[in-house]
Amino acid sequence: SAANIDNSNGNISGKMVLLSSEGVINNSGGTILNNGEYDLLPSQGIKITSRGLNNEGGKIEYKNGSVEIATVNTIKNGKGTIKATSTQGRVRIKLHSNNLNNTGGSIISSGKIEGKVNNIRNNGGAIIGLGGVDLNETVLINDTGKIISDFN
């Protein structure tokens, strides 16, 4: 667990990616992703725990695995991408945070998007969960944004 992690305009990749910080993780303009397709359990993939996450203009993506992000304060995903996809198995994106700013950003899962986020700002953004979207939000600001939940 580091005080702060700075991956701005950088690249972090691996079979499983576990990042833990007592401070802020800065991934603005950076990428955090898996370095190939693996046969993981659907619950495995990228796990980020921190006081805050800055993914503005950044990309957090896992193929054939899930993405879990837990922050105390804010997930900033303005013009950023958070994505978990799989052609087989149940993947998901799990978000726990006080605030989510997804202005102009995209959060996409071929499975579920779930968790607890008190305040969501999704102006011009897209939150798409093909297995459903359930973030238990208290406040939602969604000017020209899209939230798509598709149960096939």
Please tell me what each predicted stretch does.
Residues 3-7, 11-13, 17-19, 23-27, ...:
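Extracellular beta-strand scaffolds
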